[in-house]
């Protein structure tokens, strides 16, 4: 009987942790309401209000996630006045417990700890009290801000479902300003109410955000509201003539005879050596620091760092102009000017301006290798094939067996042919020849052939072609794609065995 109970327990636990639907049936928490309000005042100031009502459904919501038991509010005392309008917990029995005064704590945000220029920014921590199953946390606050310019991209998603999400922009009735907005609906329930001075967006029944790896950009997955109003600060204008004499020595140290490599070295220097203070630009009035300020302080926002890259490129003699996702840099190849797009948020390879973003990455390598694999037990040795620059980087260990979210992949066409010379003594044989060749409709093809030649060498052919629309693997295609990635990774190792009775020479 005891054995039957143990088996039943194991089966029950397996079904709970392996079911793709278990999260749907056991949410940790749920937002009844999220409301963001932007009210422009006649004196040129703005009131930014936020209200949330979140119901805690499981113990995990209380103990495992700091963002449920605590709320973090970023503000800049130099331009903002923060007011907590309401903060309380509604217990399961309906009683209200007000958040005590000692539960409001101001601190320096972690984003600003390594950047003295932004040490004036503060983070108000609200520690919610009286938390229990089925309680509802209510928080309502307003930030009164000097300045009325607004440029926000709001992705309407949280880490638990939202019953109702509202975005409101309210201008004075006699204002000459207008509200600019774009809304990405997707398959979600969204209603828009507007007149000449008011914009009101209501989204209902929003699911929680995906936690999968290799996700596409958030704005392509979830409903997104882009809103703007007011006069754009002049500081945001592109500084097309800004140079940086203070960085001339650094620029010289990064020099390379290949101009594109030289430009990339400058970008990489900024990414590696300038600390990122990653907070919303609205905290500093949408103003960017000069390239000199960012360089000398060793820190800046992503927008500051982009401006710095452009200025350092100009100091090095390149033509450089900023754009949304990086810098256009002009180099000379064979005497001809060529413009490349250089990302400034990560170390992506430079891309020729005008080339398709999802163009296939083509690799065709054929070369001889000398066996370089350790002993893995007894008379066996194992070698992992090299990872070539630019090759596909999808780790199947992060690909769950069931997936509902689309997967972002860079289309590729990779071909590798290796001939591996084995140790001369003793004689070695390939443990397991591999011969895989198949085509997955709408995804691509895979071919892996590992065999031993009559000469004793190991012959390896690996070919992978991924060609999916817009670089997106759909949930319907996912199972076949995952299998391709598993095979591509699994058969990247070659195992050999020494002839029986003869020891392996060396380690």
Name each model feature, range by range.
Residues 1-6:
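Positively charged n-region of N-terminal signal peptides that target proteins for export
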Residues 14-24:
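C-terminal segment of classical bacterial N-terminal signal peptides
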Residues 26-507:
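A sensor for short, sequence-defined functional sites
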């Amino acid at each position: 009987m005891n054995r039957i109970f143990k088996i039943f327990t194991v089966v029950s636990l397996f079904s709970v942790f392996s079911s793709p639907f278990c999260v749907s049936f056991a949410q940790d928490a749920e937002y009844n309401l999220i409301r963001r309000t932007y009210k422009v005042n006649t004196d040129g100031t703005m009131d930014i209000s936020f209200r949330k009502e979140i119901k805690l459904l499981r113990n995990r919501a209380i103990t495992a996630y700091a963002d449920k038991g605590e709320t973090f509010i970023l503000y800049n005392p130099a331009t903002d006045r923060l007011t907590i309008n309401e903060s309380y917990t509604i217990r399961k029995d309906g009683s209200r417990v007000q958040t005590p005064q000692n539960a409001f704590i101001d601190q320096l945000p972690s984003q600003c700890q390594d950047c003295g220029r932004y040490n004036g920014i503060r983070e108000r921590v609200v520690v919610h009290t009286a938390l229990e199953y089925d309680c509802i946390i209510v928080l309502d606050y307003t930030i009164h801000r000097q300045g009325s310019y607004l440029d926000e991209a709001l992705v309407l998603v949280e880490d638990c479902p939202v019953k109702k999400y509202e975005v409101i922009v309210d201008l004075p009735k006699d204002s000459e300003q207008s509200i600019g907005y774009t809304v990405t609906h997707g398959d979600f329930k969204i209603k828009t109410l507007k007149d000449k001075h008011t914009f009101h967006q209501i989204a209902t029944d929003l699911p929680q955000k995906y936690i999968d790896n290799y996700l596409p950009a958030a704005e392509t997955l979830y409903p997104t509201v882009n809103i703007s109003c007011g006069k754009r600060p002049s500081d945001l204008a592109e500084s097309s003539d800004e140079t940086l004499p203070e960085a001339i020595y650094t620029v010289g140290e990064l020099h390379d005879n290949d101009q594109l490599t030289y430009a990339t070295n400058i970008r990489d220097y900024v990414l590696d050596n300038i600390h990122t203070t990653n907070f919303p630009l609205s905290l500093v009035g949408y103003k960017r620091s000069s390239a000199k300020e960012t360089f000398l302080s060793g820190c800046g926002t992503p927008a500051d760092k982009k401006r710095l890259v452009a200025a350092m490129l100009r100091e090095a003699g390149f033509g450089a102009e900023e754009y949304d996702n990086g810098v256009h840099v002009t180099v000379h190849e064979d005497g001809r000017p060529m413009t490349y797009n250089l990302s400034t948020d990560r170390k992506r390879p430079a891309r020729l301006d005008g080339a398709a973003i999802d163009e296939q990455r083509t690799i065709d390598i054929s070369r001889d290798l000398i066996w370089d694999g350790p002993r893995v037990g007894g008379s066996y040795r194992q070698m992992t094939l090299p990872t070539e620059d630019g090759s596909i980087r999808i780790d199947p260990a992060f690909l769950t067996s069931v997936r509902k979210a689309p997967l972002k992949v860079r289309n590729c066409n990779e071909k590798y042919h290796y001939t591996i010379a084995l140790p001369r003594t003793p004689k070695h044989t390939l443990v397991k020849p591999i011969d895989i060749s198949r085509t997955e409709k709408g995804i691509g093809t895979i071919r892996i052939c590992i065999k031993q030649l009559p000469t004793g060498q190991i012959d390896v052919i690996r070919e992978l072609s991924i060609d999916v629309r817009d670089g997106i693997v759909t949930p319907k295609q996912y199972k076949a794609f995952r299998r391709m990635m598993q095979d591509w990774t699994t058969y990247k190792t070659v195992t050999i065995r020494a002839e029986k009775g003869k020891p392996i020479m060396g380690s």
